[in-house]
From Swiss-Prot:
Pfam families according to UniProt: DBI_PRT
SS bond list: none
UniProt xrefs under CDD domains: DMB-PRT_CobT
Superkingdom of this protein's organism: Bacteria
Name of the protein this chain belongs to: UPF0284 protein MAE_56900
Record family assignment: Belongs to the UPF0284 family.
GO molecular function: nicotinate-nucleotide-dimethylbenzimidazole phosphoribosyltransferase activity
Length: 359
């Protein structure tokens, strides 16, 4: 149920060390005006819907099915929210969930930890975030990573930032990686040309030489906080960066920060975990991107909805949705912690959808 795509030996060692461990799930929420560009994302059918995606996802993951949610899960063009996958796992396995607000236009409707960030401006401006905010969020990441690190367990770090694969492409490009054509998106056919055009607009604004400045120019508030959290937590325990393109971008950011400022990091303790729909997406090149960045193993759950009774789940097999809010990482955790099979995962997710339909 778990496949290792890169850095095989390091990935195997990580999995062996964390068998039967109950993790903590940190869900980091942020916002970028890049996500409001028409056609940039399917994580919300319209730009207006996308303003509430992160808030609605967090409410559902923490509270589960409710007849009257404050923020209902936004309608998707096709498919079901990955929040169903994440919620099914954390609910059934009683995994603790902490929600962090790195920079949202509205506060979450659940208990959360305020980080003092801000929503990002569109990366095409070349001034997405104030540099003081970027450095503050990194310091917060270091603090919380140290607080949540567990020697006998691990920390899953997931995110929700609509438009985040575009900011990921931007910071990868800003850090010197030739990532165009390799990233993924929520579209069944990745919108590479649109993403690259936006990134080029942002990069045209100024020359950038420092990783903090790359985030300030082109990033979103989640990225720098997660980088700090992973660096600090790796010193004591395991870290599972739960996501595809976005977490590979964070891994590149960590490497840049460590190279520039010599922050102590234990590379043996960090992996990137996603879904097979991201890792094997033929409209991107996730594995090639992971190899280009190096250092961290790329793993993916082999979760498969081919036999699901719900068309909204079968849509994942056609390339829709793919990943989000730590879904792949949580599915990996279910296999590690309780040895869940594909049947176990699908049943838990379908039960949740059935409950929602009857609510």
């Amino acid at each position: 149920m778990i496949k290792i795509y890169t850095e095989i030996e390091r990935g195997q060692n990580w999995l062996q060390r964390h068998q039967k461990c109950c993790p903590i799930f940190a869900l980091v929420l942020g916002f970028t005006e890049t996500g409001l560009i028409p056609g940039i994302s399917t994580a919300g059918a319209t730009p207006e819907d996308r303003k509430y995606t992160a808030i609605a996802d967090a409410e559902f993951i923490v509270k589960g099915v409710s007849p009257h949610p404050r923020y209902p899960l936004p309608p998707l063009t096709v498919g079901a929210s990955p929040a169903y996958i994440t919620r099914a796992v954390v609910e059934k396995l009683a995994i603790p969930v902490l929600v962090f607000n790195a920079g949202l236009p509205l506060p979450p409707a659940v208990d959360y930890i305020e980080l003092g960030g801000q929503p990002a401006r569109c990366l095409s401006t070349g001034r997405a975030l104030d540099l003081t905010i970027v450095k503050h969020l990194f310091a917060q990441g270091l603090t919380w990573g140290e607080k949540l690190a567990r020697q006998s367990s691990y920390l899953i770090i997931g995110e929700c930032v609509v438009g985040g694969t575009t900011t990921a492409l931007a910071i990868l490009t800003g850090l010197g990686y030739r990532a165009n054509g390799k990233v993924n998106s929520s579209h069944p056919q990745c919108n590479h040309a649109q993403k690259q055009s936006i990134v080029e607009q942002g990069l045209a604004r100024k020359e950038i030489f420092d990783p903090f400045e790359v985030i300030a120019a082109l990033g979103d508030p989640q990225q720098i906080f997660v980088a700090g959290m992973a660096i600090a937590a790796s010193g004591q325990g395991g870290v599972l960066l739960a996501g595809g393109t976005q977490m590979l971008a964070v891994s590149a950011l960590i490497q840049a920060l460590v190279a520039k400022y010599a922050y102590p990091v234990n590379w043996e303790n960090i992996i990137v975990g996603t879904t097979r729909w991201v890792a094997e997406d033929k409209t991107g090149d996730t594995v090639g991107l992971a190899r280009m960045i190096g250092k961290l193993p790329l793993l993916a759950t082999q979760l498969d909805f081919s036999a699901s009774k719900y068309p909204v789940l079968q849509a994942y097999q056609q390339g829709f949705v793919k990943e989000g809010v730590g879904a792949g990482g949580c599915a990996i955790a279910a296999c590690l912690y309780r040895n869940w099979t594909n049947q176990d995962l699908v049943k838990a997710i379908e039960n949740l959808i059935g409950f929602q339909l009857n609510c």
